């Protein structure tokens, strides 16, 4: 009996790498190579031994531009499969098009600097990752603890504010924004995995990019500023491709928020960038806000809320507040109640102030007794629930788009664009009578609203 011929080993994919430019570009190269090695690629020392070549360019002076263009041309001649990254990737020609694409139209892809995520995306597209039986057990979207149809997308870590009641900066540090390409890659992987709703979170979503001076990143060859407005636009465009939702949380009431509201109200992203803002106002009286060291204490918050509603009548505003903060007088608390009535906030949470170890608010004079703090919280919620009930009642008779979260013996439970998971209300959906109207978890369905209480809705498909 003849011996079975040995199975030839599968060749490990090889990537050639050319690094040009300054030490900052060198660090970018190191990060890309580190990621390539971590994913199982070999780094080839020659063009002809590589399956493709990555060229990290410099575009600072004319000599560097020419050197980079020459290196790209050499890589194309010697290998033929070239991905270009670095500063020259962001440079335009005299005609306004990309300089590299104009000179070397056969390159596979071009990115700007600091584009690890986008470079890896293009490498994966043209040279799939080597199979690893252990790593491949982990989905591209990562392991999630949420249901499959929605996920949280964290865009930054830390916070630059020093609110007196909060100790987050001491635990998580100052603001560090994630590179925009990394955020977009994660969002795309989540949508590809079946996620229908992305909930954008951070400690301060409005401040995204402040720490990097709104540096321009690149995604799929397009420049995107590391800035909330630009990121929301890019996420909205991506969500539209997958018929999905994007919901914004922890948005401080800065003027820049005015730029996001139109995306919710009109244009190609309407219905994808949800008309929903989670804005942690915390209080409404200027003296209390000053003691809290809230960053929005100088903003004309009520005027801004009214402007947002004029721009987007369907806007849902959720917020959280603190009742019984040290030094809060009854008059100041009444100002807060008046604000809730006038602003007509849709969803509201309130906490009775509680000292947190390490918070500077502990040093403030005027600490209130526990019973006063709790009594004010209860009065606050009574007013807030009255306002919420009036706004919710207006939805009865309307047909709303609902994302189904759960199926049970009584039908389904879902959420409208006005409701974030866990913290807002739900829609109780009657069982579908017709087979054509049956739904499952993760489906979007049109629901005719037939009833409401102060928090939730009831309806039928």
Curated annotation (Swiss-Prot):
* Binding-site list for [4Fe-4S] cluster 2: 159, 163, 166
- Which domain of life does this protein belong to? Bacteria
What EC number(s) is this enzyme filed under?
2.8.4.4
Query: Which sequence ranges are marked TM in the entry?
Result: none
Listed binding positions for [4Fe-4S] cluster 1 are 22, 58, 87
Does Transferase appear among the keywords?
yes
User: What name does UniProt use for this protein?
Assistant: Ribosomal protein uS12 methylthiotransferase RimO
Q: What organism does the record attribute this protein to?
A: Paraburkholderia xenovorans (strain LB400)
């Amino acid at each position: 009996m003849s011996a079975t011929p040995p199975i030839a080993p599968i060749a490990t994919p090889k990537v050639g790498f050319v690094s040009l430019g300054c030490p900052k570009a060198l660090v970018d190269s190191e990060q890309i190579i580190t990621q390539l090695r971590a994913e199982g690629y070999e780094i080839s020392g020659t063009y002809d031994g590589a399956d493709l070549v990555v060229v990290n360019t410099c575009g600072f002076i004319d000599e560097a531009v020419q050197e980079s263009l020459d290196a790209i041309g050499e890589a194309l001649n010697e290998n033929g499969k070239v991905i270009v990254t670095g500063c020259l990737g962001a440079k335009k020609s005299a005609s306004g098009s990309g300089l590299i694409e104009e000179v070397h139209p056969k390159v596979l892809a071009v990115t700007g600097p600091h584009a690890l995520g986008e470079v890896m995306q293009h490498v994966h597209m043209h040279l799939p990752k080597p199979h690893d039986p252990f790593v491949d057990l982990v989905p591209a979207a990562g392991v999630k603890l949420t249901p499959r149809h929605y996920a949280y997308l964290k865009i930054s870590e830390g916070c630059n504010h020093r609110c007196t009641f909060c100790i987050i900066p001491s635990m998580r540090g100052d603001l560090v924004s994630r590179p925009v390409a990394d955020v977009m890659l994660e969002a795309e992987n989540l949508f590809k995995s079946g996620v229908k709703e992305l909930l954008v979170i951070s400690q301060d979503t409005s401040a995204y990019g402040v720490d990097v001076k709104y540096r321009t990143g690149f995604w799929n060859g397009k420049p995107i500023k590391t800035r909330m407005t630009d990121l929301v636009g890019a996420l909205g465009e991506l969500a539209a491709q997958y018929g999905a939702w994007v919901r914004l949380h922890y948005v401080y009431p800065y003027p820049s928020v005015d730029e996001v509201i139109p995306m919710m109200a009109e244009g190609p992203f309407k219905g994808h960038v949800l008309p929903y803002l989670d804005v942690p106002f915390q209080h409404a009286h200027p003296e209390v806000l000053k003691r809290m060291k809230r960053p929005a204490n100088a903003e004309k918050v009520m005027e801004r809320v009214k402007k947002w509603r004029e721009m987007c009548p369907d806007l849902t505003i959720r917020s959280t507040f603190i009742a019984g903060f040290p030094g809060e007088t009854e008059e100041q608390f009444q100002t807060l109640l008046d604000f809730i009535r006038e602003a007509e906030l849709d969803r509201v949470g309130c906490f009775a102030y509680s000292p947190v170890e390490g918070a500077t608010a502990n040093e403030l004079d005027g600490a209130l007794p526990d019973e006063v703090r709790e009594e004010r919280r209860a009065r606050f919620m009574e007013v807030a629930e009255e306002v919420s009930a009036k706004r919710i009642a207006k939805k009865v008779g309307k047909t709303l788009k609902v994302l189904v979260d759960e199926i049970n013996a009584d039908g389904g439970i879902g959420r409208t664009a006005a409701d974030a998971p866990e913290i807002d209300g739900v829609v109780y959906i009657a069982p579908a009578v017709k087979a054509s109207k049956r739904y499952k978890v993760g489906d979007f369905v049109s629901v005719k609203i037939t009833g409401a209480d102060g928090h939730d809705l009831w309806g039928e498909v």
